[in-house]
Amino acid sequence: MGLTSQLIPALVCLLVCTSHFVHGHKCDITLEEIIKTLNILTSRKNSCMELPVADVFAAPKNATEKETFCRAGIELRRIYRSHMCLNKFLGGLDRNLSSLASKTCSVNEAKTSTSTLRDLLERLKTIMREKYSKC
């Protein structure tokens, strides 16, 4: 009985430590995957990289990071669904971004300035690297 009473606190401690490790590590894996995909995409010489996209970073100052990621996902979806280029990479990036994004957002193209897909991906890569350095 004495050994069991000593093991219970140790097991609880291990369980708590493991859960903290797993939750922190999930953030790292998703961000690592996003950054890896962004590195691959931005190094490509592809005509799709010059396609016009809404400048999702020109949003109001009160926009949250999650809303910005949501808008970026909308633009990525628009590109890979309508232009049939870089689908594998843009689709994967969209899926990973959706795990970091809010569920609903809007991109009002009439009021939004435009940029290129390359610029969007480069800015997104910078943001993700900063986020990863804090994770």
Curated annotation (Swiss-Prot):
Keywords for the protein's UniProt record, in alphabetical order: B-cell activation, Cytokine, Disulfide bond, Glycoprotein, Growth factor, Secreted, Signal
Species for this entry: Ovis aries
This protein's name: Interleukin-4
Function as written in the Swiss-Prot or TrEMBL entry: Participates in at least several B-cell activation processes as well as of other cell types. It is a costimulator of DNA-synthesis. It induces the expression of class II MHC molecules on resting B-cells. It enhances both secretion and cell surface expression of IgE and IgG1. It also regulates the expression of the low affinity Fc receptor for IgE (CD23) on both lymphocytes and monocytes. Positively regulates IL31RA expression in macrophages. Stimulates autophagy in dendritic cells by interfering with mTORC1 signaling and through the induction of RUFY4.
GO BP terms, alphabetized: B cell activation; immune response; interleukin-4-mediated signaling pathway; negative regulation of inflammatory response; positive regulation of DNA-templated transcription; positive regulation of macroautophagy; regulation of immune response
The keyword S-adenosyl-L-methionine belongs to this UniProt entry's keyword annotation: no
GO CC terms: extracellular space
Pfam families hit by this protein: IL4 (PF00727)
Positions bearing carbohydrate: 62, 96
